């Protein structure tokens, strides 16, 4: 005869612990809890990847808004920085745009200079 004792109990206890805080039967019933925990883990996996995309979009929006206050579009600003040899990633640029607008204005001026020098040459 097959004994399902300790390991079965341990497995169920683990699932119900992961389901703590869920609404209704999803934290009481093992079957419902298991379904919800599996779904939650899928969401967690998917959203770890989506988070990276969403933050990049947010940084680009912030940089674009700050660049437009300085008379440049996002693409012109980024191109100007590349021509000027300024190598800052989007996260850093977005932080500068929010926390230190004066520095961002100086970066925008450098980008404008680099663009005008390239077009003059």
Curated annotation (Swiss-Prot):
InterPro entries: Ribosomal_bL20, RIBOSOMAL_L20_CS, Ribosomal_protein_bL20_C. Disulfide bonds: none annotated. GO terms for biological process: ribosomal large subunit assembly; translation. The keyword Cytoplasm does not apply. Pfam families: Ribosomal_L20. The keyword RNA-binding applies. GO terms for cellular component: ribonucleoprotein complex; ribosome. Gene3D superfamilies: 6.10.160.10, Ribosomal protein L20. Keywords: Ribonucleoprotein, Ribosomal protein, RNA-binding, rRNA-binding. PROSITE patterns: RIBOSOMAL_L20. GO terms for molecular function: rRNA binding; structural constituent of ribosome. PANTHER family: 39S RIBOSOMAL PROTEIN L20. Binds directly to 23S ribosomal RNA and is necessary for the in vitro assembly process of the 50S ribosomal subunit. It is not involved in the protein synthesizing functions of that subunit. Belongs to the bacterial ribosomal protein bL20 family. This is Large ribosomal subunit protein bL20. It comes from Persephonella marina (strain DSM 14350 / EX-H1). The lineage of its organism: Bacteria, Pseudomonadati, Aquificota, Aquificia, Aquificales.
């Amino acid at each position: 005869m097959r004994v399902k004792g300790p390991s079965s109990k341990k497995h169920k206890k683990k699932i119900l612990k992961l389901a703590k805080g869920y609404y209704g039967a999803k934290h009481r019933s093992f079957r419902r809890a298991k379904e919800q925990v599996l779904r939650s883990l899928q969401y967690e996996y998917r959203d770890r990847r989506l988070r990276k995309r969403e933050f990049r979009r947010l940084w680009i929006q912030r940089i674009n808004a700050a660049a437009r206050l300085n008379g440049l579009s996002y693409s012109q600003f980024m191109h100007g920085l590349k021509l000027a040899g300024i190598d800052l990633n989007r996260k850093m640029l977005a932080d500068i745009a929010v926390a230190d607008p004066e520095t961002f204005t100086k970066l925008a001026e450098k980008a404008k200079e680099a663009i005008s020098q390239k077009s003059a040459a």
